[in-house]
């Protein structure tokens, strides 16, 4: 823990520059001005690795990474919202490609819930005279009246200006003119402010997604040096943690041993960390609101140790390189917790404010140091060392994004990683990554970077891996991975008391997008799908040093789509320290042979592409979002009803869904309970019975005689003449003194028994009263007395034999009862012959 020999201890300051009892150095713009040492370094401090470090060069075996596994899951991968979906510049052009739809349902529901007084207060003003909510279809010539019904139909496909699908109708223009002063602008102003904040947050998330800081891919060593396990998430939601057995061949190519095992989680996997202490390997996984720890057994499946829930959301985890089982967890609330198998979970640090200056980001990070009881806590403004055994608030600022490190304006901390490794003398170096530079900090010299280098990556470097040297005496490789898939390889020298330095120029490695040339040429739409798949953000990085005669590295990369790619790097023979003299220079790019695609690599890419095309369905065309659900629901119900039962069964079997009885056909309606039996058959009982069974409307129509009226309405004009003559014949028959009353009574009773039911409906009683309208005044009383004496019911419902001579009288009586004839409707007719 001594100071490096190349630095003079008198230059060490106990605090920030300009804040100590020493000379005032606050006027200096950077630490370079304060640490300029005259003279040369001592001869005994010369690093032997610098003599050949400039000749280090790693050569990839292929022009780009190759897919290791087949497309993992049948769930289609959605690339999400891109920068082109937020920005629209230039004129309108027809879109041949499907676009992402910005779903603001969650944001709108939060707005209505949080600001309901502002959102719903102006709606009462729609009842004024300027708006017609549900009016007639008549055309209104008044330009100051807006139809709300037509307006809602226009809003169903409306998009604001600046969108390629924008449209503005006349009614919307009138609504803007009339509704502006009426509805006020409080809703639009508040909604615009919240929408601007949401778009700014989405834009920052596109530039840098901090959820996958640290990487979600890890390598677990196996029983041999050439075998191990890859731990990575997969699936459409990245909620399945896979353990894939991999072995490395003598040529440096990975080989899959068996089908991977997986663990189903409740959320997407954001970070995977491994650590081996005293022969015991632990695995820690971070999700959005949960963290879990497993103990890895080389002979059996992993054993779960603990699952912890983080209420405010976890931002980072780290495993201790000193004590087995220690896990540091950071949350968005500003708290840092330490979990151990013996003591459980305990809070060691909590501060809602940032370290150096105010920054709105809730991101927090924690890692271990060379001392087992000292941790580093970082945010966007700096990194602080905290002693967990000391009083609360005790600590020392290790790095600050400011003038001490010569930071640029707007530069923020993205990653803070401890570079110590178990089994060796623990160094005191820490890696600090920002969006512009990387810094190497020494715990013994806070606030003063040992090394600063501008990496120049176009995307945020959220992944970093420090590897052991390829051979004894070689510098240690440091891999930097950007979120966009860019890779850079650095070499760091400096052990013991020597200062850390960069050995040789940094080297850029091929990215996943450069593997597009290995795939066969496809149709434009499929080619675009493949290109989007290869351009997916990289969320995981792992490296395995190869123990072979020729030093090499095997790199694994995990994309956001769940695809794992690998790449083999080999160290050029000219980089050996034994064969290259001190004056030698690095081989130029022209001298290095350009790698080409081998037939085996092309065949692997073709097989992977075939599986991808089978699993990737065609995305639906973009349609404008609608605010009205009436038409949409009707269309969906009609489309669902047209599907047959075999089609539903095939679709369910293809998706692996569970079918319910209601999915195949309509559910059977529950039968109403049986109506109670009643012995008394009267009008009230029948009406209650029909109402209990739900047929009261049909009973009422039958009761009023509407059913018989509709059946005889078509025959009424044809029978009018016959019925009129029959009524006249019946009247003359009653006036005839030759006819006796007994046969008439028998004929009428027989016709009543045949044509009527056991009870007399009120309709027939009304018909009997109407008979008197067609009879003269002096004969009405006689007809009424005769009809009152007629029997209404018969005990024997069977048919009664009638002599042939009475058939004409029976037919005449039946027709007379059914059709009344109003007086004065037709002139009096002569008495027909034979009584017909």
From Swiss-Prot:
Biased composition range(s): Polar residues: 738-754, 803-828
Biological process per Gene Ontology, one example term: transcription by RNA polymerase I
Localization annotation: Nucleus, Nucleolus
Keyword Transmembrane helix attached: no
GO molecular function: RNA polymerase I core promoter sequence-specific DNA binding; RNA polymerase I general transcription initiation factor activity
Modification type Phosphothreonine: residues: 802
Alphabetical UniProt keywords: DNA-binding, Nucleus, Phosphoprotein, Transcription, Transcription regulation
Primary location recorded for the protein, binned into one broad class: nucleus
Disordered: region residues: 662-683, 703-836
Compositionally skewed regions (Basic and acidic residues) per UniProt: 780-796
UniProt GO cellular component terms: fibrillar center; nucleoplasm; RNA polymerase I transcription regulator complex; RNA polymerase transcription factor SL1 complex
Role summary: Component of the transcription factor SL1/TIF-IB complex, which is involved in the assembly of the PIC (pre-initiation complex) during RNA polymerase I-dependent transcription. The rate of PIC formation probably is primarily dependent on the rate of association of SL1/TIF-IB with the rDNA promoter. SL1/TIF-IB is involved in stabilization of nucleolar transcription factor 1/UBTF on rDNA. Formation of SL1/TIF-IB excludes the association of TBP with TFIID subunits. Recruits RNA polymerase I to the rRNA gene promoter via interaction with RRN3.
Subunit structure: Component of the transcription factor SL1/TIF-IB complex, composed of TBP and at least TAF1A, TAF1B, TAF1C and TAF1D. In the complex interacts directly with TBP, TAF1A and TAF1B. Interaction of the SL1/TIF-IB subunits with TBP excludes interaction of TBP with the transcription factor IID (TFIID) subunits. Interacts with MYC and RRN3. Interacts with p53/TP53; the interaction prevents the association of SL1/TIF-IB with UBTF and represses RNA polymerase I transcription.
Protein name stated in the entry: TATA box-binding protein-associated factor RNA polymerase I subunit C
Phylogenetic placement of the source organism: Eukaryota, Metazoa, Chordata, Craniata, Vertebrata
Gene: Taf1c
């Amino acid at each position: 823990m001594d100071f490096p020999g190349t630095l003079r201890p008198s230059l060490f300051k106990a605090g920030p520059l300009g804040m100590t009892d020493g000379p005032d150095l606050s006027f200096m713009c950077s630490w370079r001005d304060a640490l300029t040492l005259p003279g040369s370094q001592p001869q005994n401090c010369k690093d032997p690795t610098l003599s050949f470090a400039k000749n280090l060069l790693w050569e990839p075996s292929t022009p780009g990474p190759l897919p290791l596994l087949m497309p993992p899951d049948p769930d289609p991968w959605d690339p999400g919202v891109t920068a082109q979906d937020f920005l629209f510049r230039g004129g309108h052009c027809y879109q041949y490609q499907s676009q992402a739809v910005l779903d603001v349902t969650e944001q709108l529901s939060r707005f209505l819930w949080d600001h309901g007084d502002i959102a719903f207060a102006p709606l009462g003003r729609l009842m004024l005279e300027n708006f017609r909510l549900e009016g007639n279809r008549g055309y209104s010539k008044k330009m100051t009246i807006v139809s709300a019904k037509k307006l809602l139909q226009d809003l169903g496909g409306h998009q604001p200006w600046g969108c390629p699908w924008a449209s503005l109708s006349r009614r919307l223009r009138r609504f803007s003119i009339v509704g502006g002063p009426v509805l006020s602008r409080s809703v639009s102003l508040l909604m615009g402010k919240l929408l601007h904040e949401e778009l700014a947050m989405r834009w920052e998330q596109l530039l840098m997604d901090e959820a996958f800081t640290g990487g979600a891919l890890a390598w677990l060593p196996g029983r041999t040096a050439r075998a191990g396990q890859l731990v990575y998430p997969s699936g459409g939601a990245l909620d399945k943690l896979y353990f894939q057995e991999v072995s490395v061949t003598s040529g440096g190519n990975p080989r899959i041993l068996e089908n991977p095992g997986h663990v189903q989680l409740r959320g997407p996997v954001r970070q995977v960390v491994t650590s081996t202490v005293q022969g015991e390997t632990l695995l820690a996984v971070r999700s959005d609101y949960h963290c879990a720890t497993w103990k890895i057994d080389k002979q059996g499946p992993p054993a779960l140790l603990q699952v912890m829930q983080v209420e405010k959301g976890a931002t980072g985890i780290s495993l201790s390189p000193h004590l087995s089982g220690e896990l540091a967890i950071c949350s968005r609330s500003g708290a840092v917790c330490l979990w151990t198998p013996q003591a459980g979970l305990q809070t060691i640090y909590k501060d809602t404010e940032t370290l150096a200056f105010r920054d709105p980001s809730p991101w927090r990070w924690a890692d271990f140091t060379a001392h087992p009881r000292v941790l580093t806590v970082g945010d966007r403004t700096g990194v602080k060392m905290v002693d967990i055994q000391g009083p609360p608030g005790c600590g020392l600022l290790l790095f600050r994004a400011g003038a001490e490190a010569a930071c640029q304006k707007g530069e923020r901390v993205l990653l803070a990683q401890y570079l110590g490794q178990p089994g060796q003398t623990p160094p005191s170096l820490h890696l600090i990554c920002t969006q512009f530079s990387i810094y190497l900090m020494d715990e013994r010299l806070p606030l003063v970077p040992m090394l600063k280098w501008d990496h120049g990556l176009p995307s945020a470097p959220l992944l970093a891996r420090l590897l052991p040297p390829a051979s004894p005496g070689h510098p240690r490789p440091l891999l930097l991975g950007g979120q966009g898939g860019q890779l850079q390889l650095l070499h760091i020298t400096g052990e013991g008391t020597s200062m850390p330095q960069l050995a040789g120029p940094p080297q850029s490695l091929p990215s996943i997008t450069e593997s597009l040339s290995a795939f066969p040429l496809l149709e434009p739409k499929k080619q675009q799908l493949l290109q989007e798949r290869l351009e997916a953000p990289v969320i995981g990085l792992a490296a395995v040093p190869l123990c072979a005669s020729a030093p090499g590295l095997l790199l694994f990369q995990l994309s956001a789509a769940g695809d794992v790619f690998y790449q083999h790097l080999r160290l050029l023979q000219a980089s050996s320290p034994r064969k290259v003299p001190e004056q030698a220079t690095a081989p130029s790019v022209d001298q290095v042979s350009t790698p080409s695609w081998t037939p085996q690599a092309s065949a692997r890419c073709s097989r992977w592409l075939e599986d991808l095309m089978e699993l990737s369905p065609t995305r639906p065309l973009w349609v404008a979002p609608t605010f009205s659900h009436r038409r949409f629901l009707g269309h969906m119900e009609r489309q669902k009803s047209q599907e047959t039962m075999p089609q539903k069964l095939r679709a369910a079997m293809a998706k692996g869904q569970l079918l319910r009885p209601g999915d195949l056909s309509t559910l059977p309606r529950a039968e109403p309970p049986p109506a109670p039996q009643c012995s008394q058959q009267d009008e009230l009982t029948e009406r209650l019975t029909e109402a209990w069974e739900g047929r009261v409307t049909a009973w009422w129509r039958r009761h009023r005689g509407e059913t018989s009226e509709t059946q005889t309405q078509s025959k009424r004009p044809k029978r009018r003449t016959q019925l009129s003559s029959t009524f006249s014949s019946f009247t003359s028959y009653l006036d005839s003194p030759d006819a006796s009353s007994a046969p008439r009574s028998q004929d009428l009773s027989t016709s009543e028994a045949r044509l009527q039911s056991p009870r007399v409906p009120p309709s027939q009683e009304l018909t009997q009263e109407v008979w008197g309208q067609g009879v003269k005044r002096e004969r009405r009383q006689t007809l009424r007395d005769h009809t009152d004496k007629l029997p209404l019911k018969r005990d024997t419902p069977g048919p009664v034999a009638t002599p042939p001579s009475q058939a004409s009288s029976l037919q005449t009586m039946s027709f007379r009862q059914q059709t009344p004839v109003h007086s004065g409707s037709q002139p009096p007719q002569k008495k027909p012959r034979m009584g017909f």
